[in-house]
């Protein structure tokens, strides 16, 4: 079993993402699921960032309990910048494109170098059925606030969004908080 996991890990690390999706035919159907293949792109991307927080998240994704085709991804205090965010965004798009897997909770809180472009990239890549989102303390301004408004409006299952400790004006905070009237089941913390 351990050898099989190591072989799969090696295969994921050496093959391009589009080739990884066929691994179950090589190893049989025992413990390798389609869900593992889908997340391989994201796991490899996180590892490629050479960052302790991302490495830990990749390990967690590899070892997670398979339940209801869902996962969480928390990258708090990862010193992620806009380039890292773009790579993560592309991997998220790949994971959620034509696949039935749910990202229940996502956080890049306390990444002050994320930037407006990084936040925009991530927001555009998150699935509409996400349950929780955190971008606390990311040094974001009103420009990003408008992206959050659009994201909250389009989200279908969002029940919590935490975006406090950023640089939003009071006017922008009020605009975001006014969305509670439309999204009554969503807790919005700005």
State the predicted function of each range.
Residues 1-3:
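Secretory targeting signals
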Residues 8-190:
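Leucine-rich tandem repeat or coiled-coil scaffolds
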């Amino acid at each position: 079993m351990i050898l099989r996991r190591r072989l799969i890990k090696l295969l994921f690390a050496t093959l391009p993402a589009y080739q990884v999706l066929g691994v179950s035919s090589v190893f049989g159907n025992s413990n390798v699921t389609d869900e593992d293949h889908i997340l391989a792109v994201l796991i490899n991307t996180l590892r490629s960032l050479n960052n302790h927080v991302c490495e830990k998240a990749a390990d967690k994704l590899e070892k997670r309990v398979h339940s209801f085709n869902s996962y969480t991804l928390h990258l708090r205090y990862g010193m992620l910048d806009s380039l890292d965010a773009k790579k993560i965004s592309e991997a998220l798009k790949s994971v959620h494109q034509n696949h039935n897997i749910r990202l229940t909770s996502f956080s890049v809180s306390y990444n002050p170098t994320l930037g407006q472009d990084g936040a925009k990239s991530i927001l555009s890549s998150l699935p509409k059925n996400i349950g929780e989102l955190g971008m606390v303390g990311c040094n974001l301004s009103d420009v990003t606030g408008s992206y959050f408004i659009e994201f909250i409006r389009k989200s279908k299952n969002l029940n919590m969004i935490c975006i406090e400790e950023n640089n939003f004006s009071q006017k922008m905070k009020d605009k975001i908080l006014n969305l509670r009237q439309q999204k009554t089941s969503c807790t919005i913390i700005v």
